[in-house]
């Protein structure tokens, strides 16, 4: 009977299928090709995704909404930027009239665009050889707020630096330094970054209590 089915499993499976279909396709075995999304978010997270991945239990619809737009008429194809000994790959969500666009879903509209979205869009501008771009935020009611961006060389140089850092650290098997953010609490690698510190604090408390006793 339908009532006997584990609907949570069905829903989870459906979400995972949508995620795999719409998310960026990244070859984690190829360290000579780094995806733009890897270096515009936490490098430590990207490092673990490549070296010792854990499946995230949370679907990031903020990113997946862009994948939906990539399926439309003006959806863009992946492109690469040559860095001589390696390549930076990126994919905008749409390109129309030479304007590069990315879409993100949000619960509340930000006063300013998120830093990682600015870096991602700016990277796309360089990869596609365009000058102007737009970040479009969409809320649960279907309303939108947009921010325009002009190609910036200094920001792109920072992205390139992070590309080389990620490649070197993956090759050397050395985790990047911590980059604390509001996303840490929901990250599947949280315990790899913070559990040791927590254990040390607990050990210290235990020692203090023991000394007092």
What residue spans do the PLM features occupy?
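Nucleic-acid nuclease catalytic cores
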Residues: 81-172, 191
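Short, intrinsically disordered, charge-biased short linear motifs at domain edges
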Residues: 24-31, 165-182
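Metal-dependent nuclease catalytic cores that hydrolyze phosphodiester bonds in DNA/RNA
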Residues: 1-100, 107-115, 122, 206-213
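Cysteine-cluster motifs in flexible loop/terminal segments that predominantly coordinate metals
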Residues: 36-48, 173-213
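Generic preference for well-ordered secondary structure
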Residues: 31, 53, 57, 78, ...
């Amino acid at each position: 009977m339908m009532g006997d089915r584990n609907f949570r499993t069905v829903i989870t499976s459906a979400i995972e299928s949508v995620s795999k279909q719409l998310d960026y396709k990244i070859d984690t075995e190829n360290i000579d090709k780094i995806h733009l999304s890897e270096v515009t978010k936490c490098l430590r997270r990207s490092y673990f995704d490549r070296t010792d991945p854990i499946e995230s239990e949370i679907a990031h619809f903020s990113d997946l909404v862009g994948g939906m737009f990539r399926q439309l008429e003006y959806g863009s194809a992946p492109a690469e930027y040559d860095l001589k000994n390696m390549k930076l790959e990126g994919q905008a969500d749409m390109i129309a009239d030479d304007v590069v666009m990315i879409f993100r879903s949000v619960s509340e509209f930000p006063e300013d665009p998120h830093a990682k979205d600015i870096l991602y869009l700016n990277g796309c501008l360089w990869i596609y050889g365009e000058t102007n771009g737009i970040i479009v935020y969409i809320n649960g009611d279907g309303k939108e707020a947009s921010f325009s961006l002009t190609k910036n060389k200094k920001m792109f140089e920072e992205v390139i630096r992070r590309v080389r850092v990620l490649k070197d650290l993956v090759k050397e098997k050395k985790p990047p330094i911590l980059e604390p953010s509001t996303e840490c609490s929901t990250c599947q690698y949280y315990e790899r970054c913070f559990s040791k510190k927590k254990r040390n604090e607990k050990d210290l408390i235990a020692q203090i209590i023991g000394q007092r006793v």
